[in-house]
Amino acid sequence: MPSIKVDGLDDVFARLKAIGGDIESVQKRAVYAGMGVIRDEVVKQIEQLPVQKGYLKSKDLPRDVITPREKEQLIMHICIASMDSKNGTVSTAISFDGYTDIKSKKYPNGLPAVLVARSINSGSSVRTKHPFMRQAQAAAKARAIEAAEKAAREALAEMMEG
């Protein structure tokens, strides 16, 4: 799973500690802002995946495309996972939540969205690899760090005012 580490906010956290502010809430706000930028880039990468309508027969394997329905379902189920805080570090991930409306023999209630995303991102025996998550992370890394730093500084300013 791609990860981004934001350094350079030591001054913000030192000032927060000095005024007795809640450092973890500021960290979570910053992480959420940065992950929002990455989530938007993941959606953009999914929208750029090659699409082919209709059922693909076994002679078309491995697939180098996704169906419009798979694309729609991925975009619908993308989310920012709940945050985890350990030893002063806050982390989260971009994930795909729930089940799609794409039914199969093994999944009569719908395929897990994360399974569809993983098969497209990593490839499989019947699908060519399209690493959209890694491409999104690489494309949005600088903007995500910028957004996280901005959110942390805004939170500090609000705490100092109030």
What are these regions (language model features)?
Residues A93-I102:
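Secondary-structure transition/turn motif
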Residues M1-T92, N109, A113-G162:
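Short, Lys/Arg-rich flexible segments
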